[in-house]
Amino acid sequence: MRLTFIGADHEVTGSCHFLEACGLNILIDCGMEQGINKYENAELPIPYSDVDYVLVTHAHIDHVGLLPLIYARGFRGQIMATRATCDLCDIMLKDCAHIQESEAEWKNRKAMRAGKPEVTPIYTMNDGEGVLHHFVPCNYNEIIRLNDNLEIRFVDVGHLLGSASIEIWMKEDDCSKKIVFSGDIGNKNKPLIRSPQYIRQADYVVMESTYGGRFHKNTGDHVEEFARVIQETLDKGGNVVIPAFAVGRTQEVLNYIRIIKEKNLVTGYGVFPVYLDSPMAVEATGVFKDNMMDCYNEETKELVKKGINPISFPGLHLSITSSDSVAINFNEEPKVIISAAGMCDAGRIRHHLKHNLWRPECTILFAGYQAVGTLGRSIIEGREEVKLFGESIEVKARIEKIEGISGHADETGLLEWVGSFMEKPSQVFVVHGDDTVCDAFAETVKETYGINAMAPFSGSSYDLKEGCFVTVTKGIPIQKPAVNEATKKAAGVFARLLAACDRLRRVVMHNEGGANKDLARFADQINSLCDKWDR
């Protein structure tokens, strides 16, 4: 019985753990790294063709995004996941494969012009579709036997539709052990899905720490906040544009708007139109509808039993085609537009920002986390002008953010989850958190509950039978590529350009007070130069 840590160790994305037990090779999650990562990930110590099972906690790309890659490299085992996770992966993995192919095509157009080698995508649509045939839908709370000595069970963890913690019982000779993988732990009292379900016993626990050291703000009634913004914006004749993640957050927003309409909290506009402009979000909304009775909380299931769809309402328009999307911005009626991507760095939301950001009567309403470096973050932080499709757009719309909406448990929720075990686990392994957060949260677990807790690095392995580490690694920082002479020269030329920019500013200031005619001609020349090089 050996556990090897592969991904999301001292990092937040790329979750992957390798369990060798009872004659089986098992991966728990197989996620793609996203954003900036600090450390290298260890390679799987066996060929992918030797992996028997992958157990999936939920359908987010940082937990499933490399499944098509291991399929391309020979994996032909079974992928065990809840029914809703299987359904969502059908959407997510095809979309991810499409992105890989599109990015490779774009890079190849540039490479061809520069005489550089061809770039191949890390996997193709064929791989994305091929791996889907290996998914096996599982029910919550049902014990599933993988062989005579190893059983698993999925327990709702309240992070996303279909999300789960995974319990694994193992027996080798006269030694029996149980390990629990938390998956991403959800917030309590979410509007649609259940709160995290607690597990009472485990010898070992592998748990996430995404929001370790952070505490959600309790901002009150989200429905009232949405209603206020919609009312005030429609009163001014503007549009409310809501950037939202296609899976999870979009459906929560739809539920809030349903309640607003049901209670008539926005008045004077009858059945005001709401456009859901994201093909993936439309598909995901269908998955939510198909899995209502398996995944919804009791309050929401009561609505379903009464014939009420909690994520649909009069005035909801689903936009599928590009022409549907374009038509939205030619419709002058004040409206609500929900579109992806949630951080505004891709997708149809960028078109809606282009058409609405410059209008002071409109509101851009953020209902989700905006990472550093994203367009959404820059708008929230007060950027006065942004660039969209090569065009500079002034930010004159009202910018609003609803606080406290999160799919992740904060530190209080994380501690409540790990503190729910009736007997103290022998060891807690803290993963899926930023470098310092992992270590700090492990210390918090120790101090709060007296449980052994630590945050391993990728490549470390632990003998579950003996209760000790076999291999302890340190984080290997990702090395930046060496700068060659050509790059150094390019950097020198760019420094000249920056110096020229400084000189231009000095010249502009020197001409303050000049004749209006001369200043206008000077401004036109600068703008003409900018137009030439703004590409």
Segments and roles (model prediction):
Residues 100-105, 292-305, 387, 470-492:
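A polyampholytic, Gly/Pro-enriched intrinsically disordered region
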Residues 459-518:
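Charged, amphipathic alpha-helical linkers/stalks
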Residues 94-99, 103-107, 221-223, 256-261, ...:
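Short secondary-structure boundary/capping segments
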Residues 359, 434-479:
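C-terminal, active-site-flanking charged/polar segments
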Residues 229-374, 386-387, 444-448, 497-535:
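Hard-cation-handling environments
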Residues 1-55, 60, 64, 71-252, ...:
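His/Asp/Glu-rich metal-coordinating catalytic cores
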Residues 387-418:
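Generic long, charged, amphipathic alpha-helical segments
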Residues 150-154, 287-295, 415-416, 465-476:
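Short, surface-exposed amphipathic charged segments that create phosphate/polyanion-binding patches used
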